[in-house]
Amino acid sequence: MNVAIFGSTGFVGKYILNSLIKNNHKVYTLVRKESEHKIKHINPINIINGEITNSTSLEQTMMNCSTVIYNIGIIREFKSKGISYKKLHLDYAKHVIDKAKLLNIKHFILMSANGVKDFGTGYQTTKYHAEEHLKKSGLNYTIFRPSLIFGKPKNDQEFCTQLRDTMIKLPIPAPIFFQNLNIFKAGNFKMSPIHVENVADFFVKSIENKTHYSQIYELGGLESFDWKAIIKTISIAVRKNKLTVPAPV
């Protein structure tokens, strides 16, 4: 199959690229010129240089494809640099979805996230509205909502690496979160981390498989951990005795 992917230069995107190639798909990806070096070593792929806001660039990326994967996302905003949840999760996604509809793309696969909802955090809400736009587009779609994704970083910032660098290694207590004034339940919420290779394989196995059309899949690993256990596990791995403090969400 000919597959277009948007969001191929990050942690998860590179794994999806490799899985696509391993399964003999012909891959097209839109990449800004300054980011091309991140995936130039992955072959064979067809790289289109351009901006996602440019209609011609989108058409060049998708015109020969039957499936589109939208994997653009961030877990932290930098609004001073124009990097926001709304722009990357929603505005850009809508732009690609609408173009895919015009090009009669057979199957659209969207990377969403576990716990998305309307009127949630900025991250949750923008992911939710991207899902809703896709569901109303008339395209055959598959939506994946993974839990925390971990794996070998390969010079990228995956979850455990970011947690280590931005929380565990800092000389201040790590926050353990709670909601609705339930301070005694701080850090007790459960998560089921999933390996990045499993996520990539789920994406690729769903391609143009009609049993996966109009489906939303929540992805998680075999085991569940609470936030306190995750903090403790990573702290032990980096040999650091980490204090924690309750923090409201």
Which positions does each model-derived feature cover?
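NAD(P)H-binding glycine-rich loop region in Rossmannoid oxidoreductase-like domains
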Residues: 35-41, 45-103, 114-119
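Conserved Rossmann-fold NAD(P)-dependent oxidoreductase catalytic core, especially the SDR/UDP-sugar
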Residues: 28, 74, 82-153
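A conserved pocket-lining segment of Rossmann-fold NAD(P)-dependent short-chain dehydrogenase/reductase
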Residues: 165-194, 198, 202-206, 210-213, ...
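Conserved glycine-rich Rossmann-like NAD(P)H-binding loop of the short-chain dehydrogenase/reductase
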Residues: 25-32
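Mid/C-terminal beta-alpha module of Rossmann-like enzyme folds, strongest
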Residues: 202-249
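Structural motif
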Residues: 2, 66-67, 107
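N-terminal Rossmann NAD(P)H-binding glycine-rich loop of SDR-like oxidoreductase domains
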Residues: 3-23
